[in-house]
Every structure is written in structure tokens, then in C-alpha cells.
Amino acid sequence: MRLIDLERLYDYHYWANRRLLEAVSQLTPEQFTQNVAGSYGSIRSTLVHVLSAEWGWLDRCGGPPRGERLKAEDYPTLDSVIETWNRVERDMRAFLTQLTADDLSREIEFSLGSGPTHSIPMSGLLEHAVIHAVHHRGQVSLLMRMLGFAPGNYDLLVFDSQPRETPAARQ
């Protein structure tokens, strides 16, 4: 994947995150932490999982260290999640601007849980982080619908139809 394509993918990713977090802000604190059907139990837990994973992959690729996996109970409010997510977004965008084509092709080793070690080019790992978030945004959207909210549409086609700054204008 070319760096310009990866930057576009992350532009989409953070656009969709902001829209989702705006939708989640409609929830009461109780709804935000309420256990509902889903792989992580609550909207808060799902968001913290995605945030922890993204920061972890950034760390694995050579960005700022995350340390231990983030825990939902350390994020009592949506604002606390947003604060950390804004920091991770800034760090990821800064990291992406420093990458070269050689960096993107560099093999990164990782394991999933206690399983075997795998190796994948950095570009694939960075793509995975976005695809992983898409999956969980869908879960959060479903959970919000179960709670009676309309979370909106986060499709890439919707993003592409929105006017936005060019990469040069952001610098």
C-alpha cells in the first residue's frame, strides 16, 4: 500500500471515529457503561478495546509505547475515552508522516494472545488497525440501535462524498 493511500485510510478512520463518538455522546453515562449483548459487553468496553488495539499496533510499529492493554474501568466517561483517542490520533498521524516506502514493507512480528508469532509488512498491520476498528464501529452502532439511538452512517463512500482538506492543506 502506498503511503498516500494509508493516509487517506486513516483520514477516513478518524472521520468515522469522530462521527461515532458524537453519536455515543447522546447516551447517558449509564447507557455508556451498561452491559448489553456484544463481544465486549458495553459500548465503553468496545471503544476502549479498539483504542487499546490501535495504540498497541502503533507501539508495535515503532510509535509511542502503550504499555499494558487499556482497561475499560480506567475510562469512566466518554470524555476520558475521547481525550486518549485524540492523543493516539495525533501520535498516529505524526507517525504516518515520518514513514517511507521501506518502512511500510518492513516485517513486523506479533502474536495474537498466546498463539504463535506471525510476521506481516507494517503496511498490512496499519491497514488491519483500521479494518479492526470498522468491525467494532459496526458493533457499537448495533448496540446503540438496541438502546434506541440512530448512530449514523460511517461508510467510506459517505466519507468520500464529503468535502475535506487535501493532505497539503493539513500541514
Each PLM stretch: what is its role?
Residues 7-71, 112-171:
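Short, contiguous alpha-helical
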Residues 64-105:
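Helix-adjacent hinge/juxtasegments
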Residues 108-110:
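Short acidic-hydrophobic surface loop/beta-edge motif
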